[in-house]
């Protein structure tokens, strides 16, 4: 019988690019390694996933306590399609079941960030130095392909970053279905409440952070802007196309006034490239092209959102552009910003 990985072990697996998974040897089967000596020496477990490994068991009498493994007990029926096969000798909980099990020991914000990454177009994966070197050798020698659907984003200095571009692991309909499956389960109500706040389709951690700061209700520490859209594709007019030499660009965050007449495009200037279609365009050109299309455009940086005064000025500027009234936060709303 194969191990069923869950919790942080499964989360680390789902963060692994396929290029890296291709380098990983399978785990030994428990019946062939009953004392788990082989598991301890296995590089996939020891280097990539890390000890202790977290596994899921379905009955109390199957719980054991080897030093290299910690077990999570899940009683009752599992959600649909929540256990998946891998090519590495073990089973894995689906991304959503992984997050649900992790929610037992995560804060609401931590759970929200986990779900935002799973529902986003990115993964954060920092590789150990030895694995990084092995990946480089394998790619340079042609031993593995680089066309696995995940693309590494460059940092500002052009070096490889820890940010990878990929398709979303979880779609909005997947999240809705999973929530219906866990309704009534322990921790289910909390998970469903957090899931209502998850941004879908964010292209970077910075986009998630900006979305939450602007879009969360004020009672939860945000600014309460409603209906924020992420990564909105804009087909350019002939004149705007001439500015950038492209037929389309993407708006990181699009805010609209309640009546829909005014819109503000926010471009997140992160430390690593988003890696989307349209990358390589100079920010000034993209900004000018969007302005030619009638959008008000703001550039947002880490430094700006980290400084309370600067961020407050940006929020007020957005309100002016949307013809909305800015209201100072109450003491309770200010306290929520620190939670």
Locate each region found by the language model:
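Short gly/ser-rich loop at a beta-strand->alpha-helix junction or flexible surface loop bordering the NTP-binding
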Residues: 1-187, 339
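Surface segments flanking catalytic/ligand-binding clefts of nucleic-acid enzymes
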Residues: 154-339
């Amino acid at each position: 019988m194969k191990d069923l990985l869950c919790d942080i072990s499964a989360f680390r697996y789902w963060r692994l690019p396929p290029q890296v998974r291709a380098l990983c040897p399978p785990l030994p089967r428990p019946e062939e390694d009953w004392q788990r000596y082989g598991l301890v020496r296995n590089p996939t477990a020891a280097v990539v996933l890390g000890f202790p490994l977290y596994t899921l068991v379905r009955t109390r009498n199957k719980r054991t306590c080897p030093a290299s493994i910690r077990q999570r007990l899940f009683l009752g029926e599992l959600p649909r399609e929540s256990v998946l096969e891998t090519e590495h000798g073990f089973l894995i909980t689906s991304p959503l079941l992984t997050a649900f099990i992790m929610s037992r020991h995560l804060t609401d914000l931590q759970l929200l960030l986990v779900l935002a990454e799973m529902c986003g177009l990115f993964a954060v994966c920092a590789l150990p130095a030895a694995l990084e070197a092995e990946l480089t050798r394998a790619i340079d020698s042609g031993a593995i392909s680089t066309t696995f659907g995940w693309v590494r984003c460059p940092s500002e200095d052009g070096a490889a970053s820890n940010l990878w571009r990929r398709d979303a692991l979880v779609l909005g309909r997947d999240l809705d279905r999973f929530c219906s499956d866990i309704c009534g389960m322990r921790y289910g109500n909390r998970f469903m409440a957090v899931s209502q706040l998850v941004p879908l389709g964010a292209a970077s951690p910075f986009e998630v952070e900006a979305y939450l700061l602007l879009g969360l209700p004020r009672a939860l520490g945000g600014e309460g802007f409603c209906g924020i859209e992420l990564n909105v594709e804009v087909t350019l007019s002939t004149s705007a196309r001439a500015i950038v030499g492209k037929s389309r660009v993407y708006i990181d965050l699009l805010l609209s006034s309640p009546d829909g007449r005014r819109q503000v495009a926010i471009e997140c200037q992160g430390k690593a490239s988003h890696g989307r279609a349209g990358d390589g365009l100079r920010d000034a050109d993209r900004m000018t092209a969007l302005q030619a299309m009638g959008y008000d455009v703001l550039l947002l940086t880490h430094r700006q959102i980290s400084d309370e005064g600067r961020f407050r000025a940006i929020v007020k500027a957005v309100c002016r552009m949307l013809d909305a009234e800015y209201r100072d936060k109450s003491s309770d709303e200010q306290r929520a910003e620190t939670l």
